[in-house]
Structures are given as structure tokens and as C-alpha cells.
Design a protein with these regions (language model features):
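General helical structural elements
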Residues: 6, 121, 138-142
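Surface-exposed, glycine/proline- and aromatic-rich loop segments on solvent-exposed faces
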Residues: 96-121
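Bacterial N-terminal signal peptides that target proteins for export
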Residues: 1-9
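Bacterial N-terminal signal peptides
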Residues: 9-17
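Sec/Tat signal peptide C-region and signal peptidase I cleavage site
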Residues: 19-23
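Acidic, serine/threonine-rich low-complexity disordered tracts
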Residues: 24-101, 127-229
Length: 229
């Protein structure tokens, strides 16, 4: 049964064009981080049709700063089909990221959009392989993610959540190829008590040439807003 479920997951990721990023090379048990980030049922409790809004911000010393938005539109799938129909608008204009819609989504596809954009940005600033960065993130989520319970404040209440943190380039044997951009930490906050299950995604890239606590080179933050429609 587990192997069949994993096969379904791999097929879904392949349909999204991100198989090499987040699917294992061979069947193995999913880590707690993978389960909470990719496999949790994050959409079934939503209304029949709803739009979730996320605020995106980029700050830091390396490049121009900006703010933008992402939206997740969710509707019921056809009768007898498990999951939900989803459409994501991730950022706008020349910054927009396009991936195929999901017709049987169970997990929140905004996670995939965030990671795919991040990987493309790593390629842009380092000229390194997108597939390589995908693999680093995937392996770290499999084997070296830290998952801890936390409390967040959402919609006027304190609610239980989990924070997943990864440092995918810390022990990379090829780190010397992109040393300046390798100090990059990621955190993902997920909760059953917020619409869509994903509250926040955050990455911080620090400059190895500056003292700890200096302003980051890149700080990117995506946060669920409270104005679902």
C-alpha cells in the first residue's frame, strides 16, 4: 500500500514538472518533514470555492527589494475524483512563475511554486544547475530537516503549528562552487488551523564575508493573509 501511495505521489510531482526536485530516487519511507510539507491533506476542509492570498516580500543587500502577491484558487474536483482543482498565480508580471494546474490536489501547491521559484533564482545568481539545487533541497528534507512544534498567531487566535527548517547547502561537497551564496536557511510553517495548511515560507541568505547578525543578502518571505475570499 505504501509503495502504491508513493507511486501516486511521484506521478503527481511528475505532472507538475518537479519530479527531480521532491521525489526520492527509490522508494523509501517519507520523513516527517516530507509528510507535513507535501503529503498532508491541506485542502479538503476548505469551502467548495475559495481564494487564498499570500504576501511575498524580497529584501536584502544583493538586489532590488520588492513586494508582490500569490493567490491559490481552490474548487471542487469532478464527482468521484479525490482532491481539489487548484490554480496558482505566483507573483506578477515578469516575476510570475507558471506551472501546470493540479486537478486532484491534496496538498497545497503553493509550496511547489515557492520552491521552484527559489531554485530558479539560485540558478540565476550562481549559474549552477537547477536540478542540482532541487536535489540538495530534496535530500535535506528527507534526511536532515528539523521539525518542531510552535505556536503562531492567526485570525486573532494562538494556534498550534509546526516549523520545518533546512540548511541544504551546509554540508554540500560542491559548496566551494558557490560559496558566497551557500549560507541559505529555509523555514516552512504549517498548521492544520490555517486555511490551506501553509502559513509561511521563508529563506534567508547571509553574506559569509560579514559578521553574524548583518543584514542578509537575500531575505524572501511568503505569508498567508487573513482575507480569504
Amino acid at each position: 500500500m505504501k509503495h502504491a501511495f508513493q507511486s501516486c505521489l511521484l506521478a503527481g510531482l511528475m505532472a507538475l514538472g518537479v519530479l527531480s526536485a521532491f521525489a526520492a530516487d527509490e522508494v523509501k519511507p517519507f520523513s516527517e518533514a516530507e509528510k507535513r510539507l507535501f503529503l498532508a491533506d491541506q485542502l479538503s476542509a476548505l469551502p467548495k470555492t475559495v481564494t487564498l492570498n499570500y504576501k511575498f516580500s524580497k529584501t536584502g543587500t544583493l538586489e532590488a527589494n520588492f513586494e508582490d502577491m500569490a493567490t491559490l484558487k481552490v474548487a471542487d474536483a469532478k464527482s468521484g475524483v479525490k482532491g481539489r482543482v487548484t490554480h496558482v498565480n505566483f507573483l506578477t508580471g515578469e516575476r510570475k512563475i507558471a506551472l501546470p494546474d493540479a486537478g486532484e490536489a491534496v496538498g497545497n501547491p503553493v509550496v511547489m511554486f515557492y520552491l521552484e521559484r527559489d531554485i530558479r533564482e539560485m540558478h540565476r545568481i550562481t549559474n549552477g544547475s537547477e536540478n542540482y539545487y532541487r536535489k540538495r533541497i530534496r535530500l535535506t528534507l528527507e534526511d536532515n530537516a528539523v521539525v518542531k512544534p510552535i505556536t503562531i498567531h492567526y485570525a486573532g487566535a494562538d494556534v498550534a503549528a509546526f516549523e520545518i527548517t533546512i540548511d541544504p547547502y551546509k554540508d554540500d561537497p560542491a559548496r566551494s562552487r558557490y560559496t558566497r551564496f551557500a549560507n541559505k536557511l529555509y523555514s516552512f510553517i504549517v498548521s492544520d488551523h490555517v486555511p490551506g495548511g501553509v502559513y509561511q515560507m521563508h529563506s534567508i541568505m547571509s553574506d559569509p564575508q560579514l559578521p553574524a547578525g548583518s543584514e542578509p543578502m537575500i531575505d524572501e518571505l511568503l505569508t498567508l493573509q487573513e482575507n480569504a475570499q
